[in-house]
A protein has these predicted regions:
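Adenylate-forming
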Residues: 2, 29, 33-37, 47-69, ...
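Conserved AMP-binding/adenylate-forming
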Residues: 18, 36, 68-70, 77-95, ...
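Short, hinge-like loop/turn segments at secondary-structure boundaries
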Residues: 38-40, 60-64, 109-114, 254, ...
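Structural motif
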Residues: 24, 38, 57, 137, ...
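Hydrophobic/anchoring residues in structured secondary elements
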Residues: 69-72, 238, 284-287
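Conserved AMP-binding/adenylation subdomain of ANL enzymes
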Residues: 2-41, 56
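Acidic/polar alpha-helix N-cap and adjacent early helical turns
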Residues: 307-318
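AMP-binding/adenylate-forming catalytic core of the ANL superfamily
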Residues: 43, 164, 169-170, 180, ...
Length: 318
């Protein structure tokens, strides 16, 4: 109950008189067993949980006996993970929000016309953060400096702002921070993204996580998405590594799948070739487990510290 998630999904289940199935630890075999035993229909978990289920032993052969809807958020699940979950019989619903917005501000509602798309394209659309949630009055992407609304063209990147009855009034005993977050009458999320023509917002990065290399802005999420498509990659996080010439360059921390031939650093960099611009490709890759908070979020501030100390190339760590 210490997390904003506890204000939403937990009470919704109680209100309709449904049954809670509580898992004390993320053990894929136990989760699958409980889904079957209790006839679970809904599951809520961070992308970390989806990763563990999608890449657990035998998951590629597993098929659920009944459909299970999953609400996930906190980070963008990769299209690779979404495809793996869908193949098992899960329906992935991606949401986006903050504690300051009392949980979800957007939901990626599935559109019927997506069913005709090939699976990679469908998963890509499902990985977006989605359309304005019913409790949110307004949701826009604006120029961070001027507050001007940017066009909904899927390419104009700005800060995601929102307002509505479920947005907080302010930070306790911190009027300065409150004024800063509500500049222009909107709540400033600090997240950078684009608005698509269909009204769906897509998160590109936290403002502090944007990598500026040679004057070019690089979205760490874009690099992560492409690396996550590699068949040996279980999960990945990309941060900026200081560089004396370029200012910053992308540094990727990669956790590998078990039972799959491990790629080399050069092999992963070559994987990126042709899928992204040259300046966006990671120049440093570290193989390791990713540090996380108690709620499963990747601690990028720790990775940024690790990146400063990482050598030019690192075949394996940890």
């Amino acid at each position: 109950m210490f997390h904003c998630n506890g204000w939403c999904c937990t009470w919704a289940i109680a209100v309709v008189g449904a049954t809670h199935v509580i898992q004390r630890a993320i053990v894929p075999t136990e989760i699958f067993a409980k889904i079957e035993h209790w006839g679970v229909t809904h599951l809520c978990g961070a992308p970390t949980v989806l990763n563990m289920l999608a890449f657990s032993p035998g998951s590629d052969q597993r098929r659920l006996k009944q459909p299970v809807s999953i609400l996930t958020g906190g980070a963008a699940p990769s299209s690779t993970v979404i495809r793996a979950m869908e193949q098992m019989g899960f329906t992935v619903i991606h949401g986006y929000g903050l504690t300051e917005t009392y949980g979800p501000a957007t939901i990626c509602y599935f559109q019927n016309e997506w069913a005709s798309l090939d699976q990679p394209e469908m998963a890509k659309r499902m990985a977006r953060q989605g359309a304005r949630y019913v409790t949110v009055v307004g949701l826009e992407v604006v120029d961070p400096a001027t507050g001007t609304t940017l066009p909904a063209d899927g390419t104009s990147m700005g800060e995601i702002v929102t307002r509505g009855n479920t947005v907080m009034k302010g930070y306790l005993k911190n009027p300065k921070a409150t004024r800063e977050m509500f500049r222009g009458g909107w709540f400033r999320t600090g997240d950078l993204g684009v608005m698509h023509p269909d009204g769906y917002v897509e998160l590109k990065d936290r403002a502090k996580d944007i990598i500026i290399s040679g004057g070019e802005n690089i979205s760490s999420l874009e690099v992560e998405e492409i690396l996550a498509r590699h068949p040996a990659v279980r999960e990945v996080a990309v941060v900026a590594k200081p560089d004396p010439h370029w200012g910053e360059t992308p540094c990727a921390f990669v956790a590998l799948r078990e039972g799959v031939e491990a790629p080399s650093v050069d092999g992963l960099i070559q994987w990126c070739k042709g899928q992204m611009a040259h300046f966006k490709r990671p120049r440093h890759i570290v193989f390791c487990e990713l540090p996380r908070t108690s709620t499963g979020k990747v601690q990028k501030f720790i990775l940024r510290d690790w990146a400063k100390k990482a050598p030019e190339k690192m075949e394996r760590s940890g």
